[in-house]
Amino acid sequence: MAFGTGEHATTAMSLRLLERLTRKWKHGWSLADLGTGSGILALAAKQFGAGRVTGIDIDPRAISIAKANARLNKIENVDFRLGDLRKWNPTGTRDVVAANLYSELLIEILPKLKPCNWLILSGVLRRQEDKLLRVLRRNNIDIVNVKHRGKWIALLANCSRAL
């Protein structure tokens, strides 16, 4: 099974941050779920009222599982795509970019994440937190909330100043 059952600390924290961020938003906002795995964040975004949702993963099995999860949950209009985030060239902006990835990859692809309003980043170990926060601040990304669970962190950041 592809990563992402909703029970892992990073996924659970990301879901909570996404729900809290968007609970009062009007329907139709957009989300890119990078490293979508089983598609849980993308599918939850649709349930929370997102309009345009894209899930990207490098693993073909993950994309198949994400599509199957969408069918099982009767959730439509989620664009799951196979892709290498290092080669990804986003078009337009997203209201939210969620990325549950290891910190080195998050830092590497950070310039591609900035055309958005909000970032939800997870998959980062506590011992890597300071480095990631420094890089975000250097890029004019404002950290709004950092969650900790066990050895993991997840964070919500506003990147509107970084554009």
Predicted segment positions?
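Glycine-rich beta-to-alpha transition loops that act as phosphate-gripper elements at the mouths
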Residues: M1, L34, G123-L125
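Active-site beta-alpha loop architecture of Rossmann-like, nucleotide-cofactor-dependent enzymes
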Residues: A2-G4, E104
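Conserved SAM/SAH cofactor-binding pocket of Class I
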Residues: T5-R86
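S-adenosylmethionine
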Residues: R20, I58-L163
